[in-house]
């Protein structure tokens, strides 16, 4: 039972999530032979201010100390 978690910045609409879920599911079916009814995709929408990379929050303005 594959469970795939997609963490990304908030703001994607249902159409985008549906397309991504379909692509992920199709890939797992193709490469692992798993029945699609057992494949789950979980979307985690994260505010840019709650995500950091290279020591900086993505929600910060450039040049903010």
From Swiss-Prot:
Root EC class: isomerase
EC number: 5.3.2.-
InterPro entries listed in its UniProt record: 4-OT-like_dom, Tautomerase/MIF_sf
Molecular function per GO: isomerase activity
Annotated Gene3D superfamilies: Macrophage Migration Inhibitory Factor
Active-site residue numbers: 2
The entry's keywords: Isomerase, Plasmid
Assigned protein family: Belongs to the 4-oxalocrotonate tautomerase family.
Protein name in the entry: Probable tautomerase RSp1151
Lineage of producing organism: Bacteria, Pseudomonadati, Pseudomonadota, Betaproteobacteria, Burkholderiales
């Amino acid at each position: 039972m594959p469970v795939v978690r997609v963490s990304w910045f908030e703001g994607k609409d249902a159409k985008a999530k549906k397309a991504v879920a379909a692509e992920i599911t199709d890939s797992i079916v193709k490469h692992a032979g798993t029945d699609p009814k057992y494949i789950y995709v979980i979307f985690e929408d994260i505010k840019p201010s709650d995500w950091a990379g290279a020591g900086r929050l993505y929600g910060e303005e450039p040049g903010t100390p």
